[in-house]
Amino acid sequence: MAVKAGQRRPWRSLLQRGVDTAGDLADLVAQKISVAIDPRARLLRRRRRALRWGLVFTAGCLLWGLVTALLAAWGWFTSLLVITGTIAVTQAIPATLLLLRYRWLRSEPLPVRRPASVRRLPPPGSAARPAMSALGASERGFFSLLGVMERGAMLPADEIRDLTAAANQTSAAMVATAAEVVSMERAVQCSAASRSYLVPTINAFTAQLSTGVRQYNEMVTAAAQLVSSANGAGGAGPGQQRYREELAGATDRLVAWAQAFDELGGLPRR
């Protein structure tokens, strides 16, 4: 029996390695898709594209203008000067339009920065998976609401930045906690003797993850209420101010939870 168990372990190791490789490939594809559809990254790409081609056409216009001036100074045929001058003018038109487009794109505010990458969920069966799955859904909703608030100028830019920082700080705390839970679960699978020591810690960390998700959802709900009140018939008024205060309170509670959990040793120090 011991020999058979030892023979099964390499197969399990290979299977786990294959699952990890497939997960890495899926994460890479998801990250590429996320970057492609991210409004902030899309606007930055449009800016770079307009500036790059604007400079290319500007350089071509200057080059052909210089060629025309040199040919005129050397007394070349008029028809040749017309050709080179026409090329210079033809390139000046798209150069002007592209640089004007770049200036217009620069005047547009950048959308809120979304989470840097698509994170992988804990493996199926992990105690941290439900909380992290719920966090991902809440994050997508919250950053969509932040984009609406930013475009509608419902909050000052500094408050938008504070909300973004709070969301990112909490997400980092929960991701680190989920990684600790997964590591302890693997240790329990490898060593049955450690179960009695690690299971209480796993349960405590999982409870903290649930608390973090609940606090995050409170912030999302407050943000949704603020957007709803701003788009209502009443416009700016006492209701909108009340929801704005509720959003600030929910954000403060979320940041306090993340900081307290960090100070209590729930996160790895870096």
From Swiss-Prot:
Disruption phenotype: The Rv2743c-Rv2742c double mutation reduces intracellular ATP levels under surface-stress conditions to less than 60% of wild-type levels. Inactivation of Rv2743c reduces mprA and sigB expression to 20% and 10% of wild-type levels, respectively, after treatment with SDS. Inactivation increases M.tuberculosis susceptibility to the intramacrophage environment. Keywords: Membrane, Stress response, Transmembrane, Transmembrane helix. It is a multi-pass membrane protein. GO terms for cellular component: membrane. The chain crosses the membrane at residues 50-72, 77-99. It is found in: Membrane. Coiled coil: none annotated. Interacts with PspA and Rv2742c. Involved in preservation of envelope integrity and tolerance to surface stress. Reverses the inhibitory effect of PspA on ClgR activity. Facilitates intracellular growth of M.tuberculosis. This is Putative envelope-preserving system protein Rv2743c.
